């Protein structure tokens, strides 16, 4: 990923951008807006199709070449003008060389009439790094998934059904990779039946290639001085559904109502993602308020645990970080969160080697190495080593994020009641004793390891790990700390009048009462991070019994990935795919026996701030039949069925 770079631009005498790499314009020099509306909106009949959408229905547009975002903004503008209130727009666009934020602002300033749509885009145009990046607008009514990277690497990872295509790469003669048979085959794989397509080019090899891929193509009048362009409709066969145990359940039809059990980050994010799509959601929390367990710490860290090798976990973290970072813009900076950066110290030779590999694998605006002197200057305190700095990261007050998510219109909170779920007819019913508190056709379990208290999830291999944080009173001297610093533990700049220090790992204890021993252990973690900061805090002179803190249980899985997705009925699953116990290469043509309307969002470990909000979007995509906001392989790596499949192949049960 180290070759990831922003677009290199030149600007002509009219202030319009040109690609230095491809030597081509981003839009018509005469009227880019009118060209977009003719080539893409009119050719795909979007005004008619937007207007015909039903309540809760979405139209999905796919694009090759996001560029300045002009096509997206014009489509959004038209959608807002003609679509009924309950309809949604999903837009997926691939871009190898995204514009830097300053360049995007300069380009979009050419179109002041688009300001009501371009300003929200510019406000969300941050923390965009390689891979899948999810953005949301208009209260979640408009979704934008950017695939940042080479089209022939990104599109094969996409799981979507595209209703209309915008083919808008640079001219075929200047950028032939965007007009290749391999790319056309991906367009066909991703196309919904009768998907439409528009493109400015009329090149014969493009027309023939699209016909070969399954599109019925025709030349139609071009815009302005361009005599012809291409339009078409996909008439080829539908794509294979893949392995049935990871196939999508049928998109939910009928009453759009859901129960979400659990009022931490995973539950609040799941509820918010569905509510943003027009669902009525009952959020059920057994405690008197939200974020009373692992999501209740005063400060959590946006720490990116990445791999230089593109593992599913690393890709989840990279996409999840961007999504959370954009969500945080809604909160009060300095009180609810702060983008002060995170410094991971290179505390030994092995860690230094790992950091060097990461610095070579990722863009410098995501992370870069600092020597000791640079690190101390940035942190404001003396440190034992340099390290890796994440400039866009920082600390978050998790309860504030939970509260913000839970205030999404359409969410009703029921707190102070522990419930059990029972299926009655077409609904899941939440019972407290003999009283049914709420019912809905869909339910999401988001109670960390306690999802095992619900019989359908009882055998999932989740474990609890106790963690304790220590709160230290800030001093005039300790306020010099300007960034989160991590080694084996972490310490954050003060929120109000307190620093948060943590966190311990205890795999055995089931007691949530804070202990003096773990306060002492946290102080030792601080000593490793910065003896100077320890002294500034006067921590050695603080009586342990007077220290304050809290303990909670992290929930994690054997592979450290969360469990996000639909849940199958185990006995029926074992019966349907019994052949896998003898030959794991078999793919039986039997539909997965899903538990109707039951989904999970759990197992986020110590990464919940990064992974839980995007997992809410992943769940909503599974439920609503939308493009997955993550690569398909990452979605499968997080799928609850992976453990049923593993046990079946290994001949294990329970």
From Swiss-Prot:
**Cofactor field:** FAD
Q: Which domain of life is it from?
A: Bacteria
> Can you say what this protein is called?
tRNA 5-methylaminomethyl-2-thiouridine biosynthesis bifunctional protein MnmC
**GO molecular-function terms, A-Z:** flavin adenine dinucleotide binding; oxidoreductase activity, acting on the CH-NH group of donors; tRNA (5-methylaminomethyl-2-thiouridylate)(34)-methyltransferase activity
Reaction catalysed by this enzyme = 5-aminomethyl-2-thiouridine(34) in tRNA + S-adenosyl-L-methionine = 5-methylaminomethyl-2-thiouridine(34) in tRNA + S-adenosyl-L-homocysteine + H(+)
The UniProt keyword set, sorted, is: Cytoplasm, FAD, Flavoprotein, Methyltransferase, Multifunctional enzyme, Oxidoreductase, S-adenosyl-L-methionine, Transferase, tRNA processing
* Cellular component GO terms, alphabetical: cytoplasm
Taxonomic placement: Bacteria, Pseudomonadati, Pseudomonadota, Gammaproteobacteria, Pseudomonadales
**What role is this protein assigned?**
Catalyzes the last two steps in the biosynthesis of 5-methylaminomethyl-2-thiouridine (mnm(5)s(2)U) at the wobble position (U34) in tRNA. Catalyzes the FAD-dependent demodification of cmnm(5)s(2)U34 to nm(5)s(2)U34, followed by the transfer of a methyl group from S-adenosyl-L-methionine to nm(5)s(2)U34, to form mnm(5)s(2)U34.
Question: Which family would the database say this protein is a member of?
Answer: In the N-terminal section; belongs to the methyltransferase superfamily. tRNA (mnm(5)s(2)U34)-methyltransferase family.
E.C. designation(s)? 2.1.1.61, 1.5.-.-
Q: Where in the cell is it found?
A: Cytoplasm
Q: GO BP, one example? A: methylation
Q: Where is this region: FAD-dependent cmnm(5)s(2)U34 oxidoreductase?
A: 261-654
Q: Which InterPro entries match?
A: FAD-dep_OxRdtase, FAD/NAD-bd_sf, MnmC-like_methylTransf, SAM-dependent_MTases_sf, tRNA_MAMT_biosynth_bifunc_MnmC, tRNA_MNMC2, tRNA_S-uridine_synth_MnmC_C
Q: Which intervals of the chain are annotated as region tRNA (mnm(5)s(2)U34)-methyltransferase? A: 1-235
């Amino acid at each position: 990923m180290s070759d990831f770079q922003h677009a290199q631009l030149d600007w002509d005498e009219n202030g319009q951008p040109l690609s230095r790499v491809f030597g081509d314009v981003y839009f018509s020099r005469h009227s880019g807006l009118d060209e977009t509306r003719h080539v893409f909106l009119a050719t795909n009949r979007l005004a008619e199709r937007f207007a015909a959408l039903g309540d809760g229905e979405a139209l999905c547009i796919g694009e090759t070449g996001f560029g300045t975002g002009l096509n997206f903004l014009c489509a959004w503008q038209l959608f807002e003008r003609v679509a009924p209130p309950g309809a949604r727009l999903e837009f997926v666009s691939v871009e190898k060389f995204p514009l830097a934020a300053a360049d995007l602002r300069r380009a979009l300033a050419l179109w002041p009439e688009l300001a009501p749509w371009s300003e929200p885009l510019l406000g969300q145009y941050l923390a965009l790094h390689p891979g899948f990046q999810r953005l949301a607008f208009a209260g979640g009514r408009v979704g934008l998934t950017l695939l940042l990277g080479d089209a022939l690497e990104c599109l094969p990872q996409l799981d979507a059904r595209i209703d209309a295509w915008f083919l808008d790469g640079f001219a075929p003669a200047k950028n032939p990779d965007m007009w290749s048979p391999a790319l056309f085959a991906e367009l066909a794989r991703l196309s919904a039946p009768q998907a439409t397509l528009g493109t400015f080019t009329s090149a014969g090899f493009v027309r023939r290639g699209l016909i070969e891929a399954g599109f019925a193509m025709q030349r139609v009048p071009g815009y302005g001085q361009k005599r012809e362009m291409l339009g078409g409709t996909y008439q080829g066969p539908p794509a294979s559904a893949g392995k049935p145990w990871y196939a999508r359940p049928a998109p939910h039809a009928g009453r759009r109502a859901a129960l979400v059990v659990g009022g931490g980050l995973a539950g609040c994010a799941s509820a918010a993602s569905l509510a943003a799509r027009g669902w009525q959601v009952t959020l059920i929390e057994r405690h008197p308020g939200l974020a009373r367990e692992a999501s209740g710490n005063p400060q959590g860290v946006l720490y990116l645990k990445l791999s230089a090798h593109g593992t599913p976990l690393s890709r989840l973290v990279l996409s999840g970080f961007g999504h959370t970072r954009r969500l945080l813009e809604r909160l009060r900076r300095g009180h609810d969160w702060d983008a002060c950066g995170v410094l991971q110290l290179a505390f030994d030779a092995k860690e230094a080697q790992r950091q060097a590999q990461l610095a070579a694998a990722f863009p410098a605006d995501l992370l870069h190495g600092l020597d000791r002197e640079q690190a101390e200057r940035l942190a404001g305190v003396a440190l034992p080593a340099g390290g890796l700095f994440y400039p866009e990261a920082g600390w978050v007050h998790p309860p504030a994020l939970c509260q913000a998510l839970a205030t999404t219109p359409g969410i009703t909170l029921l707190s102070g009641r522990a419930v059990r779920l029972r299926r009655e007819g077409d609904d899941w019913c939440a019972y407290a004793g003999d009283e049914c508190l709420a019912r809905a056709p869909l339910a999401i379990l988001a109670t960390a390891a306690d999802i095992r208290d619900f019989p359908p999830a009882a055998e999932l291999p989740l474990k609890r790990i106790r963690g304790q944080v220590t709160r230290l009173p800030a001093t005039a001297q300790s306020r010099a700390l300007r960034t989160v610093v991590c080694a084996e533990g972490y310490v954050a700049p003060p929120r109000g009048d307190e620093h948060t220090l943590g966190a311990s790992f205890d795999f055995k204890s089931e007691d949530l009462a804070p202990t003096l021993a773990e306060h002492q252990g946290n102080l030792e973690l601080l000593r490793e991070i910065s003896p100077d900061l320890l002294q500034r805090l006067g921590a050695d002179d603080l009586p342990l019994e007077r220290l304050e803190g809290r303990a909670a249980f992290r929930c994690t899985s054997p592979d450290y990935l969360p469990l996000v997705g639909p849940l199958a009925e185990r006995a029926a699953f074992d019966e349907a795919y019994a052949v896998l116990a003898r030959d794991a290469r078999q793919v039986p043509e039997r539909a997965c026996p899903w538990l109707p309307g039951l989904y999970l969002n759990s197992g986020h470990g110590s990464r919940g701030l990064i992974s839980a909000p995007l997992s809410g979007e992943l769940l909503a995509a599974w439920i609503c039949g939308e493009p997955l906001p993550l690569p398909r392989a990452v979605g499968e790596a997080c799928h609850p069925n992976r453990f049923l499949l593993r046990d079946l192949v290994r001949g294990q049960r329970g």
